[in-house]
UniProtKB/Swiss-Prot annotation:
Protein name: SH3 domain-containing protein 19
Biased composition annotated in UniProt, kind: Basic and acidic residues: 296-305, 474-484
Tissue-specific expression: Expressed in hair follicles.
Keywords associated with the record: Cytoplasm, Phosphoprotein, Repeat, SH3 domain
GO biological process: cytoskeleton organization; regulation of cell morphogenesis
């Protein structure tokens, strides 16, 4: 019975092989006819995980010809032959109940024979029936592990480009036919090899069949025929190629993309990883656009949306930021003045060709421009180098020492060991010092042979004591300081208010005056019973009264000792010396910083005549600061000279007769009042300045209304410039708002905070003034007028 059963099983296998051959000739249309192979392949589904990767590349190369289906069938049979026969036997039992117990064993050798023959011979199915009897069973088994090994370790690195190139070889029409035939046959006849492909986890070739299998309603109907249609005998000729190509699909995703129509899920997962090749592969399969084209398109659109979202995320954060908020808030330029940046330099003034006075000659731009052009032609550095040379000439490195009779002499030299040369000294050797009669020689140390090491300017040398008159010897420096300072009072006024410091007082505030025990302090003002304001060592400040011994106190009038001084101050204007001035001529009045001068007469716009106690003389007005109003009665010269200049001011401006100190300004911008104290105005309005609250705010009057307004919104009127020029004798001054560095020799350089005595207007943008003995021109927008109290 066993022999009969084996013969019957072999006959059935031969008949099935013939059926396979017939179906391969008819290609795909014959797939639904043979349902017999399905029971064999379905059970091996979970077990054939190892052989699956080999199948994927084959169908990719020959999809249109239909060999892909035969290769899948062959793979399914080979896997069933390795150990999946127990699963295939029950399915065959369902089809042929007589052979159920016997078929599980023999279909497996039959399949292995056919596969063996195919792999070894590579011939068509016609030879398979004969070879099925001759080929032994164990031969095909080692082939499968070889295939799996090849898949695990691909030896051919050049195979992936072959796979990519294989799909385009087929025409679009043939591929479309293959997909259509597969799409039509697969739903009706779901091939069993598909479940095996899922278990194997191979590339999308098998997954394509897997998707087709679930579409079939019943696996028991014609699926067996579909498996028989897949010819395992045609595959042997391409077995080796499939091994090579089986390795290829794993690294490359293009075969997966081609089979996207069968597996929309994988398309969605894999397309975003390789977006560039997709557009070219869309037309290869019609089902791709129908089934998986949509999700792939959604993925493509999804990515740019995400990118836009990520990019827009930064943009979205921009709008909510603070910049848009101030737009709806208070307008900044209306109330707040612009940042204090130095204004632009105005163009040089256009001066008339002829000048009426010699004082304007230095400001002739043509001469300075010619000098600058010469400097630029001679020096590569140009103007910058010329500037440095100019300033170096203006500021000598070491001025000569004050000589006896100079007000600075007693303050700066009496405490220093020094002497005065009695005769002209000509050095006979390099160690001696040459000097002229009257030069002040600073004594450095005692030299050998009874000589003294002295210094004159930057030169040092030896001088014999017989050639000089020693004023402060080396060993009397501590004693001579207080005595000398006491002597220094006599030439000025021995009765001037002063005191002697009893204790050292270190300054703790910016306006404090540091004192050392024994120093003499000039008393300028008595603040209260406990504090004085005084001057010492060319410094002015406040100090406590209990730290000094008052020698001559300040009278209650706080103007000085003598009644005549107080009466004069009540009658006429007073000036406070801003700098020390030493007269070069006998008719000049010398004074120290902080001293109060009675202004008795204006000699001209630059010079005035004044009195300090019992001394009188002329002095430059730019060295003093006017602190008293001009009296209606007082010095005749003052009353005769000032009123005409005030009258000249009146025609320049309509309402300047109200008060000489009043200034007019012109609005550069419109100003809207934000508080009840603000003074609104429009651009071009002329405003009378009543008070300067600080450097940024003024109080003014416009149309019978008073209020405060920002200084940066206005500028002095051109007519005011002329008035100011004529008011210079009254002590009109300007204060520097910014640092200004002159670019030409005729320009006046200054720093912010300097007070300049303005002497003459040049034009609407420039004026001429003096500062610390230097005269020059400067731009008006760098300064502001100071209120005259």
């Amino acid at each position: 019975m066993n022999i009969m059963n084996t013969e019957q099983s072999q006959n059935t296998i031969v008949s099935r092989i013939k059926a396979f051959e017939g179906q391969t000739n008819t290609e795909i249309p014959g797939l639904p006819k043979k349902p017999e192979i399905i029971p064999r392949t379905i059970p091996p589904k979970p077990a054939v995980s190892s052989g699956k990767p080999l199948v994927a590349p084959k169908p990719a190369a020959n999809r249109a010809s239909g060999e892909w289906d035969t290769w899948a069938e062959n793979r399914l049979k080979v896997t069933s032959r390795e150990g999946l026969t127990p699963y295939s036997s029950p399915q065959e039992a369902g089809i042929t109940p007589v052979t159920k117990p016997e078929l599980p064993k023999k279909p497996t050798p039959g399949l292995t024979r056919s596969v063996n023959h195919e792999t070894s011979g590579g011939r068509p199915m016609a030879e398979s029936p004969d070879t099925g009897k001759k080929i032994p069973t164990p031969a095909p088994r080692p082939l499968l592990p070889k295939k799996s090994a090849s898949t695990d370790a691909p030896p051919y690195p050049s195979i992936p480009p072959k796979l990519v190139s294989a799909p385009p070889r087929l025409s679009v029409a043939s591929q479309a036919k293959a997909f259509r035939s597969l799409g039509e046959g697969l739903p009706s006849n779901p091939p069993v090899p598909a479940p095996q492909s899922k278990a194997l986890g191979d590339i999308d070739l098998i997954s394509f069949d897997d998707d087709v299998l679930p579409t079939s309603g019943s696996p028991a109907e014609e699926p067996t025929g579909s498996e028989t249609v897949l010819d395992p005998f045609q595959l042997p000729t391409k077995t080796e190629a499939t091994k090579e190509r089986a390795v290829q699909p794993a690294p490359t995703r293009k075969p997966t993309v081609i089979r996207i129509p069968a597996k929309p899920g994988k398309c969605l997962h894999e397309e975003p990883q390789s977006p560039p090749p997709l557009p070219a592969e869309k037309p290869v399969g019609n089902t791709h656009s129908a089934v998986s084209g949509r999700p792939s398109h959604s993925d493509r659109t999804r990515n740019p949306e995400l990118e836009q979202a990520s990019e827009s995320g930064g943009l979205v954060q921009g709008p909510p930021r603070l910049p848009p908020r101030p737009v709806h808030g208070k307008v900044i330029p209306v109330w707040r003045p612009p940042p204090k940046g130095a204004p632009e330099r105005p163009p040089p003034p256009k001066l008339p060709a002829s000048k009426s006075s010699n004082k304007n000659l230095p400001f002739n731009r043509s001469s300075s421009d010619m000098d600058l052009q010469k400097k630029q032609s001679h020096f590569v550095s140009g103007l910058s180098k010329a500037k440095s040379q100019i300033f170096k000439n203006q500021d000598p490195v070491l001025p000569p020492r004050p000589k006896p009779g100079h007000p600075l002499y007693r303050k700066y030299m009496l405490s220093v060991p020094h002497g005065i040369a009695n005769e002209d000294i000509v050095s006979r050797n390099p160690t001696e010092l040459s000097c002229k009669r009257g030069d002040v020689l600073v004594i450095l140390k005692q030299a050998e042979n009874n000589y003294l090491e002295c210094q004159r300017g930057e030169g040092t040398g030896r001088v014999h004591p017989s050639q000089m008159k020693i004023v402060t010897p080396l060993d009397e420096r501590p004693r001579g300081r207080p005595n000398d300072s006491g002597h220094s009072q006599k030439p000025v006024d021995s009765g001037a208010p002063h005191a002697v410091a009893l204790h050292d007082f270190p300054a703790e505030q910016a306006d404090d005056l540091s004192l050392t025990s024994g120093e003499i302090v000039y008393l300028l003002e008595k603040i209260d019973a406990e504090w004085y304001r005084g001057k010492c060592r060319n410094q002015t400040g406040v100090f406590p009264a209990n730290y000094v011994k008052v020698i001559v106190d300040i009278p209650e009038g706080r103007s000085g000792k003598r009644e005549s001084f107080s009466s004069h101050c009540a009658k006429g204007p007073r000036c406070v010396a801003r700098f020390e001035y030493i007269g070069d001529q006998k008719d000049e009045l010398s004074f120290s910083e902080g001293e109060v001068i009675i202004l008795t007469e204006y000699v001209n716009e630059e010079w005035g005549r004044g009195e300090i106690r019992d001394r009188s003389g002329i002095f430059p007005l730019n060295f003093v600061e006017l602190v008293g109003d001009h009296p209606t009665s007082g010095a005749n010269i003052l009353s005769t000279k000032v009123p005409p200049k005030t009258k000249n001011e009146d025609p320049g401006s309509n309402s300047q007769d109200s008060s000489p100190p009043g200034e007019w300004c012109k609005a550069l911008h419109s100003f809207t009042a934000e508080t009840s104290e603000d003074l609104p105005f429009k651009r071009g309005d002329r405003i009378l300045i009543l008070e300067r609250l600080d450097s940024d705010w003024y109080r003014g009057r416009l149309h019978d209304r008073e209020g405060i307004f920002p200084a940066v919104f206005v500028q002095p009127c051109p007519a005011e410039a002329k008035g100011v020029a004529s008011a210079i004798p009254k002590g009109r001054k300007v204060k520097a708002l910014y640092d200004f560095l002159g670019e030409n020799e005729d320009e006046l350089s200054f720093k912010a905070g300097d007070v300049i005595t303005e002497l003459e207007p040049i034009d609407d943008a420039w004026m001429r003034g003096e500062l610390m003995g230097r005269a020059g021109m400067f731009p008006k927008n760098y300064v502001q007028f100071l209120q005259v109290s």
